[in-house]
Amino acid sequence: MDLAPLRAPTPPAWVAEAVRRWPELLADHANCEKKAASTALALMFAYPEDRELTARLSRLAREELRHFEQVDRLMQDQGLPYLRQKPGRYASRLRAALRTHEPFRKLDLLLSGALIEARSCERFRLLASLPEGAGLPAPVAALYAALEASEARHYQLYLRLAERHAQEAGLAERRAEAGALIATRLAELAVIEAEAATSPDTEFRFHSGEPAAGEPAVGEPVLRESDLSAREP
């Protein structure tokens, strides 16, 4: 499938804020890794009869928890305390758009998971590629560079699981039809994701929107399937 999941780039103002407030960024990133593992486990509990899904997401959950350990260790190395932060708006806005009846609920859960992983991949890339001296502390930038490929794999895994579900649930008879169905629904959810990730936001989080005034430019895709190509976990 030739999909372009993200409909708007991360605002430059968010990147600047992330550099300025990197201790808070790390704290929320640690929370995000735990939430990602929790999401995978929730899907395993919701659909235990789907053996491929449970096997794949079991591995993904373990990897997300290893990432949490890496972030937590880095925070300790940097002398940063653990911060309790209330959730941002990003995930809740995506959840509000998901359908509640099967087989569409499962499809939307998988596609929203793909979008979140794609946004994480994009932000890791942006932060890791900043010039030395103008970006994050070197250990933080190095960790984000290392994590980018994992987020790409997770994005692709969620998409593959969604495509398989579309066929097995009878939403599409052939793979090409499943791809078209997924592309349509992914594009719909991507508009909501882009608004949450780019519109003015009063809180700073790993997936928050622009911290300054201004309207987001939601339009052409900015991150394509080829940018996220990587081996499956």
Where would I find each of the regions flagged by the language model?
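Non-heme di-metal
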Residues: 1-233
